[in-house]
Amino acid sequence: MNRIYRVIWNCTLQVFQACSELTRRAGKTSTVNLRKSSGLTTKFSRLTLGVLLALSGSASGASLEVDNDQITNIDTDVAYDAYLVGWYGTGVLNILAGGNASLTTITTSVIGANEDSEGTVNVLGGTWRLYDSGNNARPLNVGQSGTGTLNIKQKGHVDGGYLRLGSSTGGVGTVNVEGEDSVLTTELFEIGSYGTGSLNITDKGYVTSSIVAILGYQAGSNGQVVVEKGGEWLIKNNDSSIEFQIGNQGTGEATIREGGLVTAENTIIGGNATGIGTLNVQDQDSVITVRRLYNGYFGNGTVNISNNGLINNKEYSLVGVQDGSHGVVNVTDKGHWNFLGTGEAFRYIYIGDAGDGELNVSSEGKVDSGIITAGMKETGTGNITVKDKNSVITNLGTNLGYDGHGEMNISNQGLVVSNGGSSLGYGETGVGNVSITTGGMWEVNKNVYTTIGVAGVGNLNISDGGKFVSQNITFLGDKASGIGTLNLMDATSSFDTVGINVGNFGSGIVNVSNGATLNSTGYGFIGGNASGKGIVNISTDSLWNLKTSSTNAQLLQVGVLGTGELNITTGGIVKARDTQIALNDKSKGDVRVDGQNSLLETFNMYVGTSGTGTLTLTNNGTLNVEGGEVYLGVFEPAVGTLNIGAAHGEAAADAGFITNATKVEFGLGEGVFVFNHTNNSDAGYQVDMLITGDDKDGKVIHDAGHTVFNAGNTYSGKTLVNDGLLTIASHTADGVTGMGSSEVTIANPGTLDILASTNSAGDYTLTNALKGDGLMRVQLSSSDKMFGFTHATGTEFAGVAQLKDSTFTLERDNTAALTHAMLQSDSENTTSVKVGEQSIGGLAMNGGTIIFDTDIPAATLAEGYISVDTLVVGAGDYTWKGRNYQVNGTGDVLIDVPKPWNDPMANNPLTTLNLLEHDDSHVGVQLVKAQTVIGSGGSLTLRDLQGDEVEADKTLHIAQNGTVVAEGDYGFRLTTAPGNGLYVNYGLKALNIHGGQKLTLAEHGGAYGATADMSAKIGGEGDLAINTVRQVSLSNGQNDYQGATYVQMGTLRTDADGALGNTRELNISNAAIVDLNGSTQTVETFTGQMGSTVLFKEGALTVNKGGISQGELTGGGNLNVTGGTLAIEGLNARYNALTSISPNAEVSLDNTQGLGRGNIANDGLLTLKNVTGELRNSISGKGIVSATARTDVELDGDNSRFVGQFNIDTGSALSVNEQKNLGDASVINNGLLTISTERSWAMTHSISGSGDVTKLGTGILTLNNDSAAYQGTTDIVGGEIAFGSDSAINMASQHINIHNSGVMSGNVTTAGDMNVMPGGGTACR
């Protein structure tokens, strides 16, 4: 916009014209004809003026000259060519009452023409008419290059044409219009043209300007106007394009105060780039009425409305119009900015149109307008501030960031009332931010929308008691490119709207935290349309309430047509009438209720109405279903997923809860109910509601935790037990299994428990199809309750069926169901084997009872027998389909034993065989055929059909080397000796070793397998010796002998847990071997002689009273020392088991590889005796590591979990390289501790004692009072020891040596001498 006027002579019209380019918002350019003097020089001569007049086309007439201290009074009618007052000197012209001065030509009149001149014209009741004889207005320069003053008082009247105050650089012009009926009329009025101009209208004085009024016309000029005390300035005629300019290129200021009045058309403040304009409207009854207000057009403009001042705007206002401009409006102290127009088109305000704009309303200021937009164009930046009680903006809509950047801050009980649609971030480039704080409020009334992020970016932040209230809908992220964010930040803040749509077509985010409240009692939509994405986070005791007493929808919909996400965390609460997740077929919705006291409360819950919906209840979050019904996958093609804990495939999490629900129903789509939680307690996670729905695609997925189904569920589809434990506690005799009619798959890590807790009187028949290779456990209310399968179960289950309290018949459908499965018979289970071959995957005995339909004597094969791939009849672990199971190898086998039956073997047991073969002799009827056999069967008890044990019928004394050392019980028993199944045989059942005697087991030359195994139970108080050239095994887990176990030669293998009974000592001779074979054994004391070997093979050995190991320990597993001292001598390089040292127990080492590469869990005492080298084991626990007997060891393991204590005795040394080598342990140092570190290390450990500390390496070691408590010598050989505290560290070391390249720094008080060697030093850090 060009506000530089060019004055030209129009020969046709015979007038001067002032031409300017007035750019309108509609893009038009207009020219205003203004009469203007050509006298632009700073100093004039009469010749120059005459030339100018000649050039103007008029004959020069007589001019009135008042100069050289003249005073001229006019009180009659006069006419002059020009009035020249104060040409070079001082002149005063008084036009008194009765005086009527006029012009005869077109000459310019001047008051204060040249430098140092001073002219004054006083119009005191007279009239001065500056029009020529043709009634053409003529120029008047007041303060051309000198000082000029025009005073209009006492009803004086001046009819001016083109009036310029300070018309040239250095000129100072002043016009004072004072008193009622004192009048100045102008056409074009410049106040500060090139110099300085002042206009004062006071005491009801009256001024008019009919073409343009300018304050501060040219750069460097200054124009000041004061309208006060009833004074009035009228800047207008019938042409609405007339302009009032404050600071065109110079500086202008207009002040309206004490009842002053100004009426103007278009008002421009800070018109050009160098222009600075200020408009002040202050005091009661002070008013300016304008048509359009441009504040900061190209330059800088400021409007101050204060102390009840009033601006009336007939049409719109722009603040910060063009790029680079700056406009400010301050409405304060009950000031009022009022827009008079009717309709939105003529009442709007742009704060930051293309430039920078500010609107500040405070101290009961008031703005009444149409739509207010902050940041209109892309380059525009607008800031609105409303603060203080009774400070109010009332408008027809508020837009922040239309295409530019808009900000609004409402605080300290300030109020914005928008009676029309409002937006933040309207266009794609628009950014709108609103902050409502400290009791501020924004009200959006009537049936209009509020949109946060229409196509741009919008942010609404509410905190410290801020409030937002809307009587209609609020959108966040309306169009595809829109991004809207709402932040509610504390308990005193609230957001009230009829409805909220978060992510309509764009992206919306709502964060409600710290006890804040969001009310949307009509509805809440998250992800409204296809491209929409919405996220709502309700956290930290905050509330989103969609419920009222009215009959409105009160719906919460997450993923309407787009993508929605609702996170309720850390005590957040959401309340709705009905909640729907993923309404339409392409929508996606996710709801997460996470944390204690986090709550989603709804009447009914729909997860996956037609789209893909997920509800996750985790970490004690709660879903309260007041209507009782939860629907998953309501219509096709919906997928509705309800997660308890975590989603399928994720890491398990603490479970959430569902209250007041009566059912979870799978709909016509795909319903998925996932249990993936961390509740592994015996009580488990209780599910009381009914799971129902005839959905072939429905799924119950169990991934982790222990879950209990208590209802008689009727759902179809699938039950997938992938991991964890699913307990079915409800069943009926008519086939209601608690898993409906679903197909059940138990994956390898998964476990399905079938209990009878809700129906103690009934049997249980599994009518479900069963697949997978995991574990199914059955425990009914008592052992006499029948468990069985049906034909529907199929033959695909390949896992383990672990039967506890139950009765089971192995025939027909039951046998078929276990075709590929392992049958594990536990205590209180009775399984009857019917006639014929019953072929199943495997049989494992764990305390149960198997009844065979056969008798003895009989044929070699029972009438009813079992065929298996794997038979497990020994104590210990077995592996089935890659999963490990633990059994005790015990149980009862019932057969028909005639009474009496006289067996000739009972009179003469075969005793000519090796003792190790006595348990396997006289093999009779085969009960089980097996491809693979684990265990000897020696722990099984043979009983008759009445349950009575088939007792030994012969006891023999067993003598060795002429001395009776034991007694042997012989009779019918069970054996796997042939290696292909389970048999009834007649042989040795038990051995009882006499106290004080030793029973030696040695296989017959070359014997192996069953012929070198003792499966009979070994008891008694005597000792057991193994003396073999090859190997002897013990396979009875019921052994309970108390004497010592001597492995004198060869190998002892333990094939069952507890095979060593209650032995008081395990003593292994030179070259002898003990093979734990993965089993668990306990001994009182342990003696491993030089040259002996213990093969752990992932087994466990517990030593209760210590001992000594001089041989080799090898393999992985566990060595548990629970008491006494176990001395381990020598190295065990192939040992990698975990060594656990209990409190009150000790392990001592004389070699750094005494415990190989295994970890050490030390809660007792680990003693290093005369050990040198690198200790690479990782140590954990809270015990003690003691370095004694001139030990010198470098700790290289990761000991970060060790919180115990390192003790260094006098003459011993420990060294470390990294912080993890010391863990979090303390150090009692009476020897030498060497710390070699290349990195900085802030040591927080306690180091005490009388020993020395040596610092090596280039790193910085920082000590505190605890780590500097040792009293010995400190040698800083390399790097730096620093003392890292603001207060001085008390270093107890008695002597400090700082070697070459060593440094000591920090704030420290030393207890002894300090020796700084050449190259060493100290420093202040």
Swiss-Prot record:
The keyword rRNA-binding does not apply. A lipid is attached at C19 (N-palmitoyl cysteine). One of its GO terms (cellular component) is plasma membrane. It is found in: Cell membrane. It comes from the Bacteria. SUPFAM superfamilies: Pectin lyase-like. The keyword Transmembrane does not apply. It is a lipid-anchor. Keywords: Cell membrane, Lipoprotein, Membrane, Palmitate, Signal. Residues 1-18 form the signal peptide. Its main location: membrane. Pfam families: ESPR, PATR. A lipid is attached at C19 (S-diacylglycerol cysteine). To E.coli YfaL. NCBIfam families: autotrns_rpt (TIGR02601), PRK14849.1 (NF011422), rpt_T5SS_PEPC (TIGR04393). PANTHER family: C-TERMINAL REGION OF AIDA-LIKE PROTEIN. This is Uncharacterized lipoprotein YdeK. The gene is ydeK.
